Amino acid sequence: MTKRIDSSLLYTALVVLLLLGVVHRSNARPRVNRPPGFMRFISNATDFASEDYYDYIIVGGGTAGCPLAATLSQSFRVLLLERGGVPYNRPNVMSHDGFLTTLTDVNNFDSPAQSFISEEGVPNARGRVLGGSSAINAGFYSRADKQFFENSGLVWDLSSVNQSYEWVERAIVFRPQLRTWQTAIRDALLEVGVHPFNGFTLEHKVGTKIGGSTFDRTGRRHSSADLLRYARSSNIRVAVYATVERVLLASSPSVSGSNVSAIGVVYRDQLGRFHHALIRDRGEVILSAGALGSPQLLFLSGIGPRSYLSTWGIPVALDQPHVGDFVYDNPRNGISIVPPVPMENSLIQVVGVTEDGAFLEAASNVIPFASPLHSVFIRAPASPLYVPVTTIMEKILGPVSIGLLRLASTDVRINPVVRFNYFSDPQDLERCVNGTRKIGEILRSRAMQDFMIREWFGNRRFRFVGAPLPVDQSNDLVMADFCRRTVSTIWHYHGGAVVGKVVDSDLKVIGVNSLRLVDGSTFNISPGTNPQATLMMLGRYMGLKMLRERMR
């Protein structure tokens, strides 16, 4: 009976809010997104020859692949293969307000976001569009933390790192304009002691800061695909709707000691026709297909544990026991509330970085509300009711818990199977408990008072959507249970082909000539509060490094 009354009150309240104009939606029409000038070297894979030769073949036009291709094209002939389409003709992808729609409007064929569910049952997504996940994410931009560079397994030229970040930032990074919810979160973080206030900065710093955004002031998205503007158009070709089936490998005894070499790739176009792209002398195949796609392609190309590949009937080119191992995903936990005040769509702009390994972020969205109740007094509205929902979330540093990726099929279009083993390491659980406790402090701050509803006799409370924080937040066991029950993803999964196990310090696949991985599959830790800045930097950084290698 109580639940029925509460649902009825919620529905009535929403109708009243609508009549008062508190619940609202943006009436702005999507901007007309004119194709950028570099579209002239982007073509459907159906337009490509059945066989052609290139200096570099990059598989995956995503967050790292686009800047890598643009850089290498300055001196060499480059082919960039993307399994999805272009983002510029998709208003929801290109719009700040289309973020949630892009993540939920998915199919098995060509949607910009491809959904998958981990074996734990946590829904997730991967990019399937030029620009990769940088074209479907929340747009937050922040550089990596010091710990990432120290523990990555790579020897970094920090001067080149900074120059590569700046190269990205000049093109696609903007200072966000804080409005109601993000301003309140900034004030709340400072009130509960997440100090100091670092203002607007792209650097990773302990305290509270305003980060960069890949959405401009008009709400238009700028993804890594925009970095193709830097490409030398006479040296680059980009094929969209090009699904790479496998890397072509050949036996080739060499001075390096490896007797297997990559010589090209096989890809399929939308009509089902196969194409062969082959590399010239001293060329390379580079996998930039992401933490799911790159390990999957290694398996399908015959690189992986011998006994495992044999069970799938895949001919073994290289017995590599660690492909698909050391997979990680940063768990996200938090709460959502329906505020009693007008609210805008805002994605992550402010972050609180705590000393004990928690990153605190927030977002607000105006979403359609569908009531399960029917009333003879209220006719179905011509348009849906829209409800503001605000969220406070925390992501943990690391993580330490290790997962596993394996094939679900020999069809590359089918997502691999992945288990992230969230909170299997006690250190991750401890960090989550600390982070969710800090969310509790934020909710009790003065800055959050305006987001509580007023009840009879002067009482005030939050109207939660989904699970609220436990009442007894001092109890470690209760808080740990909350972390496990409410775990979700922040889409920062990585690993599966990590440095020192599958690739060396130059990101070359150990035991294979002319094959390199440049993407998040090589990471053993997520960089900073959001990995996209570092992945784009990595594409530029490795491109410059490879150009220097060829000049020797």
From Swiss-Prot:
Q: Does the keyword Lyase apply?
A: yes
A GO molecular-function annotation: flavin adenine dinucleotide binding
Documented EC number(s): 4.1.2.10
Q: Does the keyword Oxidoreductase apply?
A: no
Active-site residues from the entry: H492
Stored Gene3D superfamilies = 3.30.410.40, FAD/NAD(P)-binding domain
Q: Which residues form a coiled coil?
A: none
Q: Which reaction does it catalyse?
A: (R)-mandelonitrile = benzaldehyde + hydrogen cyanide
**Alphabetical list of PROSITE patterns matching this protein:** GMC_OXRED_1 (PS00623), GMC_OXRED_2 (PS00624)
What keywords sit in the KW lines?
A: FAD, Flavoprotein, Glycoprotein, Lyase, Signal
Q: Which residues are glycosylated?
A: N44, N162, N259, N434
Family membership: Belongs to the GMC oxidoreductase family.
Q: What is this protein called?
A: (R)-mandelonitrile lyase-like
